[in-house]
């Protein structure tokens, strides 16, 4: 279940955001849900052992903002408003979001009144056992340990052997929460395809905390039903903070070449 949400400002004034805006989009999503539903989703979510999953994700803003310097800080300005994609495997989340958002229509975003001007439900896609995906928001996977009473977080890169395994373990937990079935027999493997460790590394500040993620195009092989859950809920960690959303990617040059043959 996916939708593209478009927000505009009053009288075409445009919308101004900080460079690191994930927490603001998350706030916007929760604000546009019914209050009781939003509180339960945020505080409880869907439990798997000690872990709690929100089972939704969202993309980066789809438009390129214009840089502006205000009070010595760089900001992003969106003169025509902005759009982002939202996904969830839970029908009730998307239903509540769209219904409540259409009723309210407006929300406060850093003192700016923004309006939900358009909702586009995305068509379903067919997922295959072998395909390519492109991240619409950085994928992050990490492990937190305690060293001398201090919590330390180690972020893994696609070059690390644990990267794929941790993504798989995370996806299996989400699969169980969505379907109620064990995913122990299901698997997938992900390989960098069009990827550069320098160009595709993304460090996002989320409420002041740096989170390391990765963008780019990857090849994935695995069970479509497991991939379907990650398509709707996101790959990796921090999905509800705007990480791990992906789309099916096709090499246009290869398609054009095949059409000529």
List where the protein language model places each region.
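RNA-interacting cores
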Residues: 1-261
């Amino acid at each position: 279940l996916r939708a593209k949400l478009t927000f505009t400002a009053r009288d075409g004034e445009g919308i101004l955001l900080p460079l690191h805006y994930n927490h603001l989009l998350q706030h916007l999503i929760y604000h546009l849900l019914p209050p009781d539903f939003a509180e339960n989703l945020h505080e409880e979510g869907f439990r798997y052992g000690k872990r709690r999953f929100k089972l939704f994700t969202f993309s980066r803003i789809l438009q390129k903002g214009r840089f502006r310097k205000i009070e010595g800080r760089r900001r992003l300005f969106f003169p025509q408003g902005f759009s982002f994609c939202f996904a969830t495997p839970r029908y009730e989340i998307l239903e509540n979001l769209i219904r409540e958002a259409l009723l309210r229509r407006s929300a406060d975003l850093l003192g700016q009144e923004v309006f939900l001007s358009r909702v586009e439900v995305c068509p379903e896609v067919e997922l295959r056992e072998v395909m390519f995906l492109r991240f619409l928001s950085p994928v992050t996977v990490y492990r937190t340990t305690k060293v001398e009473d201090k919590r330390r977080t180690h972020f893994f890169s696609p070059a690390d052997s644990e990267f794929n395994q941790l993504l798989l373990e995370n996806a299996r937990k989400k699969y169980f929460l969505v379907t109620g079935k064990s995913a122990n027999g299901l698997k997938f493997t992900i390989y960098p395809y069009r990827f550069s460790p320098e160009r595709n590394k993304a460090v996002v500040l989320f409420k002041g905390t740096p989170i390391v993620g990765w963008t780019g195009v990857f090849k994935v092989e695995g069970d479509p039903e497991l991939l379907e859950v990650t398509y709707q809920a996101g790959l990796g960690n921090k999905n509800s903070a705007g990480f791990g959303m992906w789309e099916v990617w096709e090499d246009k040059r290869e398609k054009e070449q095949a059409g000529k043959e």
